[in-house]
From Swiss-Prot:
5-phospho-alpha-D-ribose 1-diphosphate binds at residues 94, 97-98, 102, 104-107, 122-130, 134. Pathway: Amino-acid biosynthesis; L-tryptophan biosynthesis; L-tryptophan from chorismate: step 2/5. Mg(2+) 2 binds at D239, E240. GO terms for cellular component: cytosol. This is Anthranilate phosphoribosyltransferase. It comes from Geotalea daltonii (strain DSM 22248 / JCM 15807 / FRC-32). Homodimer.
Length: 350
């Protein structure tokens, strides 16, 4: 199948979702050769990936991931019988690769949202293009990545937050590692990670590194059964909701995708400069994250609040972003968000 798919994609023909599933099955089972994988993902990048192609690939990755159980059930985005009140779980994640070198905003947001009573399955990896990926800062904060899936499950169930280290839970990705490194360009795999949370998080805030991906990935999330989510791109290049300028956003519900341009002033926040949000290496960013959780004020705290607000809306904890900001402020000022960090640290090192 993959040889035929390469020939078609080279001619700029789109694949159906079922055809993409067949190709990805070959890639992730080890049937496709490294040369075939490299040729296919390069041709796909040159043609441009469609919603159906991305969704098909994401379904295969999800099916082959080590599943993380929350409560009594494995959450599955394909299920029609999800009780959203009992099983709401959120992921706040970016594609990475935006090149802005900010501190780890979505990781900080995860602790804040968890402190507001939302179960968080934070899916992440080491750095792609910055000095510090989410896994790097989590490790620098003293949270162990060398844990079993059962420990991750226990963290989410007991602490309300767990870190899902992508390489440990997506074993079938090993067949694509070599070709990806050797060709050295962005491919479909750069956007699949945030779409393939092993806990099946039905609520999501997803940051992307290109504006044209906002509505495309919003439609992918809808295709995959997302209950509610936001896809965001800061017009300064950030794969987060930014405070330096406007943010292109798309809200996802089972019924529709709605896009708009969000301004920080809409929620009463002052704009800042990119330098105000810059990060450093893992150790420096860990100091920043802990400082915010301990109550330090400033633009870094503000950008966490604004991103947490939309996470709380996505999870149904807040009726609107303004209410979300109030809840996030309380989570930080009360020490509840810091307590989530300490609890997760303790559970992963027990």
């Amino acid at each position: 199948m993959i040889k035929k798919a390469i020939a078609r994609v080279v001619e700029r023909e789109d694949l159906s979702q079922s055809e993409m599933i067949q190709v990805m099955d070959q890639i992730m089972s080890g049937e496709a050769t490294p040369a075939q994988i490299a040729a296919f993902i390069t041709a796909l990048r040159m043609k441009g990936e469609t919603v159906a192609e991305i969704a098909g690939a994401a379904r295969v990755m999800r099916d082959r991931a080590t599943r993380i159980r929350v409560g009594k059930n494995v959450l599955d985005l394909d299920r029609d019988d999800i009780n959203i009140d009992l099983e709401t779980i959120l992921d706040v994640v970016g594609t990475g690769g935006d090149g802005t070198n900010t501190f780890n905003i979505s990781t900080t947001v995860s602790f804040v949202v968890a402190a507001c009573g939302v179960k968080v399955a934070k899916h992440g990896n080491r750095s792609v293009s910055s000095a510090c990926g989410s896994a790097d800062v989590v490790e620098a904060l003293g949270i162990s990545l060398e844990v079993t899936p059962e420990t991750v499950e226990n963290c989410i169930n007991e602490a309300g937050i767990g870190f899902l280290y992508a390489p440990a839970l997506h074993g079938a990705m090993k067949f694509a590692i070599g070709p990806r490194k050797e060709i050295g360009i962005r491919t479909i795999f750069n956007i699949l990670g945030p779409l393939t949370n092993p806990a099946g998080a039905p609520c999501q805030v997803l940051g992307v590194y290109r504006e044209e991906l906002v509505e495309k990935l919003a439609h992918v999330l809808k295709n995959l059964g997302c209950r509610r989510g936001f896809v965001v791109y800061g017009m300064d290049g950030m794969d987060e909701i930014t405070l330096t300028t406007e943010t292109r956003m798309a809200e996802v519900t089972p019924e529709e995708v709605k896009a708009w341009l969000f301004k920080p002033e809409d929620l009463g926040f002052a704009r800042c400069t990119m330098d105000d949000l810059r990060g450093g290496d893992a150790v420096a960013n860990a100091v920043t994250v802990r400082g915010i959780l301990e109550g330090e004020k400033g633009p870094k705290r503000d950008v966490v609040l604004i991103n947490a607000a939309f996470g709380l809306v996505a999870a149904g904890r807040a009726a609107n972003p303004a209410e979300g900001v109030k809840l996030a402020v309380e989570a930080l000022d009360s020490g509840a968000a810091l307590a989530k960090l300490e609890k997760l640290k303790a559970l992963t090192n027990a």
